[in-house]
Amino acid sequence: ARDMTKQALPAVSEVTKDTLEEFKTADKVVLVAYFAADDKASNETFTSVANGLRDNFLFGATNDAALAKAEGVKQPGLVCTSPSTTARTSSPRPSMRTYPRLRKVASTPLIGEVGPETYAGYMAAGIPLAYIFAETPEEREEFAKELKPLALKHKGEINFATIDAKSFGQHAGNLNLKVGTWPAFAIQRTEKNEKFPTNQEAKITEKEIGKFVDDFLAGKIDPSIKSEPIPESNDGPVTVVVAHNYKDVVIDNDKDVLVEFYAPWCGHCKALAPKYEELGQLYASDELSKLVTIAKVDATLNDVPDEIQGFLPSSLFPLARRMPQSTTLVPHCRGSRPVHRRERLTQASASVGEAVEDATESAKASASSATDSAASAVSEGTETVKSGASVASDSASSAASEATKSVKSAASEVTNSASSAASEASASASSVKDEL
């Protein structure tokens, strides 16, 4: 019945100073536009959005400049309200992008609760998330009340949420907080996976947290970075990466980089380790090590820019001019089209190793053939010596020449095979880049 009533109303209802307050509470999410009557573009955009979303939200509009001023809105402006909060924006010309952003802000609780059902939504919100860790519902309610003025002040800039420290306390470690020391507060810049933990000895009060949040927004606080020491040497087939050299090794270099993000306790990671070392050996030659780096990072001890969704993912970071964005590969996931393409990218990278392995086997066979040929020639030369010194000299010279040609041919095959392997892998990666 409620939906039928909404359908009976116009897509955009006209509001006045007498009806505005009641209209604001008429639905879960209400958008009111304050546009001048002659602002044709803004009015048309608002009406178009309203026609498409009238089943989900309530839309109202007024051309009354005095009412806009009384509401503290500068024309052209939009105000989005819900039972828990109000969000507003003023701009020279609100665009279609304005509306989803306002609806998302207005529909997010002022201080919500982080849990399995809400975590993904907070991560996708596009703004930082402030965590309030506390053990009991009573404590979480108390801190929510204490920090409510800050949540109101920074609505649309930072999401505030409590989190059950008993059930999800281990997540504090991901934010570089000390697990077990409660209550605790930290901000996560979700888009960059940067962490800003507070001093856990300080009290969680509006004053203390307010200053921390203001400094965070002003860029006065550096993110907390957890890192192992940079290795003194990295001579093995697999380069060890830590947080403090991640940018230099993985991002700012002139090579393609394949990175394994692992956890020492992960059984799958342990099973992969010897194979990954073999892969590193395949790329250890002078020819290929100039093009590709095989690397690994302990994701439990090092912060990295990308959030790791479980362990054992590998990420290929191609040279920027070939593919400017990193691609995360999760081998144990199946079914989605993006993952399928990512697996193809992994295969394109792995084809280098396979081709090099083929080239190596070919080289061994060619070298063996060359050795046999040389031995046979020397044997024939020896027999010839027995029959005549002059003929022996010519035969030995001819044998040495043939052996040299055979070895050169084998070396040429190795070089061509490796070059072809690198060329095919580069072309394959380029093809996948075009699809992505």
Curated annotation (Swiss-Prot):
<feature type="domain" description="Thioredoxin">
    <location>
        <begin position="216"/>
        <end position="365"/>
    </location>
</feature>
<protein>
    <recommendedName>
        <fullName>Protein disulfide-isomerase</fullName>
        <ecNumber>5.3.4.1</ecNumber>
    </recommendedName>
</protein>
<dbReference type="GO" id="GO:0034976">
    <property type="term" value="P:response to endoplasmic reticulum stress"/>
</dbReference>
<feature type="region of interest" description="Disordered">
    <location>
        <begin position="328"/>
        <end position="436"/>
    </location>
</feature>
<dbReference type="GO" id="GO:0005788">
    <property type="term" value="C:endoplasmic reticulum lumen"/>
</dbReference>
<feature type="compositionally biased region" description="Low complexity">
    <location>
        <begin position="385"/>
        <end position="436"/>
    </location>
</feature>
<dbReference type="GO" id="GO:0003756">
    <property type="term" value="F:protein disulfide isomerase activity"/>
</dbReference>
<comment type="similarity">
    <text>Belongs to the protein disulfide isomerase family.</text>
</comment>
<feature type="active site" description="Nucleophile">
    <location>
        <position position="269"/>
    </location>
</feature>
<keyword id="KW-0413">Isomerase</keyword>
<feature type="short sequence motif" description="Prevents secretion from ER">
    <location>
        <begin position="433"/>
        <end position="436"/>
    </location>
</feature>
<comment type="function">
    <text>Participates in the folding of proteins containing disulfide bonds, may be involved in glycosylation, prolyl hydroxylation and triglyceride transfer.</text>
</comment>
<feature type="compositionally biased region" description="Low complexity">
    <location>
        <begin position="362"/>
        <end position="377"/>
    </location>
</feature>
<dbReference type="InterPro" id="IPR036249">
    <property type="entry name" value="Thioredoxin-like_sf"/>
</dbReference>
<keyword id="KW-0256">Endoplasmic reticulum</keyword>
<feature type="site" description="Contributes to redox potential value">
    <location>
        <position position="268"/>
    </location>
</feature>
<dbReference type="InterPro" id="IPR017937">
    <property type="entry name" value="Thioredoxin_CS"/>
</dbReference>
<dbReference type="InterPro" id="IPR013766">
    <property type="entry name" value="Thioredoxin_domain"/>
</dbReference>
<dbReference type="Pfam" id="PF00085">
    <property type="entry name" value="Thioredoxin"/>
</dbReference>
<dbReference type="Pfam" id="PF13848">
    <property type="entry name" value="Thioredoxin_6"/>
</dbReference>
<keyword id="KW-1015">Disulfide bond</keyword>
<dbReference type="GO" id="GO:0006457">
    <property type="term" value="P:protein folding"/>
</dbReference>
<feature type="compositionally biased region" description="Basic residues">
    <location>
        <begin position="334"/>
        <end position="343"/>
    </location>
</feature>
<feature type="disulfide bond" description="Redox-active">
    <location>
        <begin position="266"/>
        <end position="269"/>
    </location>
</feature>
<keyword id="KW-0020">Allergen</keyword>
<feature type="active site" description="Nucleophile">
    <location>
        <position position="266"/>
    </location>
</feature>
<feature type="site" description="Contributes to redox potential value">
    <location>
        <position position="267"/>
    </location>
</feature>
<keyword id="KW-0676">Redox-active center</keyword>
